[in-house]
């Protein structure tokens, strides 16, 4: 894989933030309120998987992964 630019890394980090926000909003009942439990669970599971993959990448510099790791833990404990 080619080296990522700083802009590409920033885009990945922003996308991770979107996953964090969505996981937290679903758990708080602020997102997907009209969806059934299976859809909410699937969405949380997919976003947790995305975060797990991205946190493990070796191209990160000084980016703070605290929110991502917290969302992973919260999502793993979530049952819709």
Regions found by a protein language model. Give the residues of each.
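Intrinsic disorder/low-complexity segments
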Residues: 14, 28-31, 49, 53, ...
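N-terminal acidic leader/helix
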Residues: 3-28
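Short intrinsically disordered terminal tails
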Residues: 1-4, 38, 70-80
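Charged, low-complexity interaction regions
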Residues: 20, 31-39, 55-66, 80
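N-terminal start and proteolytic maturation junction detector
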Residues: 12, 24, 56, 70-72
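Short amphipathic alpha-helical heptad-repeat segments
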Residues: 15-22, 36, 40-52, 68
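A general marker of short, structured functional hotspots
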Residues: 8-9, 46, 55, 74
